């Protein structure tokens, strides 16, 4: 009788079947068969019992994808240092936090030059003021005015002091403004402070833009004193700004300070650089927004906020 050589090298009679290599394939088939039987027998899947999801929300990720993303993010975080050292002068360096808007000592960014204003002596303050007065006097002369005439004698000093006031947000401390006014209330519904008057200076032409800001957030149990939201808005407005960045900085600061589920900021303003010069469109307004967290991922939540502040009516 003819013989065949089996996988292990031994001879076996022709026509006989070699024993299976492993039973892994059979086990998989058995599992699939049991799943089909369970489905056909009317057994409920666990996903059916879950509450209905808003179709506009982002789909939930499977546990394996979440685990993979968590591993990736932790690896990326390990590659980024927790603090960043930035050279301020040849003799000193400042260790900066990874925050996009708040520096290591609570000052809001950019704060490299303005930290000097916070720490300077009275003599240094007067020296700064005198330097600014001289610059304003030069501007008056360059436009053809007489800085020594009666109406302009005190203008250089007035303008210098006004400019220091309008940019005082650089040297204000976020921690001092919040002053510990964060309370664990177990509240998880939307909080909105709307129609906050905002005055800022366009960094391109050094003329004002004014308008209203609406701030909303959904807490993660902790709430902030409602007066702190307008104060945070003013802190970032009292500097040279553009509206897009101002909107984003306010949202990022609240997100960092409070760690809520999400933050939404909408601002509508009129820019004098577009009203008094350039295209000279007096009735135009500019609207900007920044949505973070659940306001970004859930359309239903975002639309509720816009409806409550009256934007989409």
Curated annotation (Swiss-Prot):
Compositionally biased residues, Basic and acidic residues: 1-10, 40-64
The protein, known as: GTP cyclohydrolase 1
Low complexity biased stretches: 11-20, 72-102
Catalysed conversion reaction: GTP + H2O = 7,8-dihydroneopterin 3'-triphosphate + formate + H(+)
GO MF, any single term: GTP cyclohydrolase I activity
Pfam families: GTP_cyclohydroI
Family named by the database record: Belongs to the GTP cyclohydrolase I family.
Keywords: Allosteric enzyme, Folate biosynthesis, GTP-binding, Hydrolase, Metal-binding, Nucleotide-binding, Zinc
CDD domains, A to Z: GTP_cyclohydro1 (cd00642)
């Amino acid at each position: 009788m003819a013989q065949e050589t089996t996988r292990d090298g031994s001879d076996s009679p022709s026509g006989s079947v070699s024993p299976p290599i492993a039973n892994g394939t059979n086990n998989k088939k058995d599992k699939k068969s049991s799943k089909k039987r369970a489905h056909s027998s009317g057994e409920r899947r666990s996903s059916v019992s879950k509450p209905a999801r808003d179709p506009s929300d982002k789909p939930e990720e499977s546990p394996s994808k979440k685990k993979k993303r968590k591993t990736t993010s932790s690896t990326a975080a390990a590659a980024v240092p927790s603090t960043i050292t930035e050279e301020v002068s040849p003799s000193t360096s400042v260790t900066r936090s990874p925050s996009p808007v708040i520096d290591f000592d609570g000052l809001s960014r950019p704060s490299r030059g303005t930290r000097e204003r916070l720490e300077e002596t009275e003599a240094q303050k007067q020296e700064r003021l005198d330097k600014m007065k001289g610059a304003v006097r030069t501007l008056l002369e360059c436009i053809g005015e007489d800085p020594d005439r009666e109406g302009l004698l005190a203008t250089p000093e007035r303008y210098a002091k006004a400019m220091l006031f309008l940019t005082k947000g650089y040297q204000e401390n976020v921690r001092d403004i919040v002053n510990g006014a964060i309370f664990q209330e177990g509240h998880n519904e939307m909080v909105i402070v709307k129609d906050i008057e905002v005055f800022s200076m366009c960094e391109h032409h050094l003329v004002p833009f004014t308008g209203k800001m609406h701030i909303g957030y959904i807490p993660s149990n902790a709430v902030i004193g409602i007066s702190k939201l307008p104060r945070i808005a003013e802190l970032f407005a009292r500097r040279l700004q553009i509206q897009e960045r101002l909107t984003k900085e306010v949202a990022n600061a609240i997100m960092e300070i409070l760690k809520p589920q999400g933050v939404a900021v909408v601002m509508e303003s009129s820019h004098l650089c577009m009203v008094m010069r350039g295209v000279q469109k007096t009735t135009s307004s500019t609207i900007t927004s920044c949505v973070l967290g659940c306001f970004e991922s859930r359309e239903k939540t975002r639309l509720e906020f816009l409806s409550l502040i009256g934007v989409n009516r």
